Amino acid sequence: MSDKIRTLQGRVTSNKMDKTITVAIERQVKHPIYGKYIKRTTKIHAHDEANQCNEGDVVAIRECRPLSKTKSWTLVEVVSKA
């Protein structure tokens, strides 16, 4: 296992759960045949201990041990408020 901790940045799409946020992470992928760059989105559940995030916030998250069946990321900081 690597010593580097994975960190990502994305936009909060849902904060309806208790101490959990859903973060959408956009990336650009090149189409294998046509060569055009396409936006692809990955949704990740992250732990928000203080319930401080709102929908539309840009946040930084980092990988951690599994906290539940679907949650293995935790909130590092709120980069910008919505």
From Swiss-Prot:
UniProt keyword annotations, A-Z: Ribonucleoprotein, Ribosomal protein, RNA-binding, rRNA-binding
Superkingdom, natural source: Bacteria
GO molecular function, a single term: structural constituent of ribosome
GO annotation, cellular component aspect: cytosolic small ribosomal subunit
Gene3D superfamilies the record matches: Nucleic acid-binding proteins
Example GO biological process: translation
Short name of any one Pfam family annotated for the protein: Ribosomal_S17
Subunit structure: Part of the 30S ribosomal subunit.
Family designation: Belongs to the universal ribosomal protein uS17 family.
Role this protein plays: One of the primary rRNA binding proteins, it binds specifically to the 5'-end of 16S ribosomal RNA.
PANTHER family (UniProt xref): 40S RIBOSOMAL PROTEIN S11 FAMILY MEMBER (PTHR10744), SMALL RIBOSOMAL SUBUNIT PROTEIN US17M (PTHR10744:SF1)
Protein name: Small ribosomal subunit protein uS17
Gene source species: Shewanella oneidensis (strain ATCC 700550 / JCM 31522 / CIP 106686 / LMG 19005 / NCIMB 14063 / MR-1)
Lineage: Bacteria, Pseudomonadati, Pseudomonadota, Gammaproteobacteria, Alteromonadales
